[in-house]
Amino acid sequence: MIEKRHTVRKYLDKPLDVDLVSLLNARIEQNNKLYDLTFKLVTNESDGISSLAKIMSNNTVQNYIILAGKECSSLDEKIGYCGADLILYAQSLGLNTWWCGGMFNGKNALKHLDDKDVRVNGVIAIGYGKTQGVPHKSKTADQISHYQGVVPDWFNAGIKLYYWHQVL
């Protein structure tokens, strides 16, 4: 699934299927409980997306996942792990995503959360992409690692997984 997932910034004007919304909400709830987070899927709304991101997407983003949680030393790590889980899960459901990074409106996103005592750390745009995105230029395993002797399969698999995790 990692190899199939690419950033998509432009989306079709098509509401998310209600069954997919239910599946996404269940996965979000599972991650929220396991990692003490406050993620939330917002549908048919773009107020959590920054003006710049809206320009980049031609105003096609209509759904997003709020990435938030209570302040703690591991918040960024937990958000990164669970955010990656959600973008790969969305891809497995036939949806496309864009981790908007710093291009979000935290105040507007916070309005959708019951708990206002959290830090909104970003949003992930989600929907049916106009395209499936394009792969980024990738480095070879030799360019990002070094192993003396015969390289075992587990090492190459780990390097490949590590690299893909970095470019999500």
Each model region followed by its residue ranges:
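Acidic, surface-exposed loops and disordered segments
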Residues: 1-168
